[in-house]
Amino acid sequence: MGFSENGKINGIKIILLSNGGNVLDLSGPVMTRALTHLDNCYSFKNFFAKGYICKTNTVSNTAFRGFGGPQGMLAIENILDEISKYLKKPLNDVRAINYYNKKNGLKTPYGQLVKNSKLQKILNEIEKFSNFSSRFREIQTFNEHQIKNGKSLRKGIAMMPAKFGISFNKPSLNQAGALVNVYMDGSIRLNHGGTEMGQGLFIKVAQVVAECFGVTLDKVFLSPTNTSEIPNTSATAASSGSDLNGMAAWNASKVIKNRMEDLVIKLSLIHISEPTRLDGI
C-alpha cells in the first residue's frame, strides 16, 4: 500500500483468505461479495485484490447476513485506521480525502459507476445532528482521565460510512416468479418465490397485489412458499426479496387485470373508452 502525507491512498494490493471449511458450500459467492466491497466508499487510482478460499478441516457453515460484505469493508477500514494512526490525523479526515467524488473518481475497481453519491452531504448532516465532534472530545477527555487514574473503564464513539451492494453478484439470480389467481367472489390467491422469515415479505407482496387490483388487503390470500407452484426461485437474500418478488407479483397481476378490463369492454353493450372502476373492480 502506498499513501501520501495527507492520507490519500495512491495504490493498494489486498489478498483475502477465507476459511471455507471441508466443503465449498457458498464460500465462492461470499468471497465474491467480500472482494466487491473492499473499496467500501473510497476511490483508488491503483487497486488490486485477489481472494483465496482455503479448504480446512472444520465443519462447513453456510453464509448469514452480510455475506462477505462486512468482511470486505472491515479490511479497508482497518487499513485507513492504520494510516490515521501513522500520520496522526483524524480517521474521518483520512476517510474524507479518499471518498468517491468527481476529483478522486466515481468508478469502482470492478467497473461500476457510482452515480448521484450524496455520501459527504449525508455524513456532514449525521455528524452535525449527532454532535459527534463534541462527544468525541468528551469521551477522549474521559478516557485520558481513566488512564491517568489507573482505571480500566473506557468509552468509545465511532462513525463509519458504508456502501453495500443490493441484489446478487450473479445476474441470473436476480429474478423471481409469482402465480396470481382471481376467483369469482373477488378474492385473490397469491403464490411467490420469496421466503417469509419475520421480515414482513408476505404482507409487502400482498400489498403490491392489492394496490394493482385496487382492492383492500383482506381480498388477497397468500399460500406458503412452494417450489411446486413457483419453481427455480432465487434465495430470499441480498436485500432483494421485496423488489424481486413484489415486481413479479405486480407483473402477474397486471396481466390478469388487463384481461379483465378487455373483457369488461367486450361484454359492454356500449363502447367504453375508459372502464369505470368501483372498489377496484
Segments the model singles out, each with a brief description of its role:
Residues 50-52, 217-241:
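Flexible glycine/proline-rich, aromatic-decorated loop/lid segments
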Residues 99-187:
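Helix-loop-helix junctions that connect adjacent transmembrane helices in secondary transporters/permeases
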Residues 270-281:
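Single conserved hydrophobic/aromatic residue that forms the stacking wall/gate
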Residues 29-34, 63-93, 98, 167, ...:
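Alpha-helical support elements that line or immediately flank enzyme active sites
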Residues 16-21, 48, 100-103, 163-165, ...:
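Acidic, glycine-rich active-site loops and adjacent beta-strand->loop/helix elements
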Residues 41, 177-181, 212:
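Short, surface-exposed charged micro-motifs
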Residues 1-78, 165-175:
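Glycine-rich loop/linker segments at domain edges
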Residues 26, 106-109, 192-193, 232-237:
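Short acidic, glycine/proline-rich loop/turn micro-motifs
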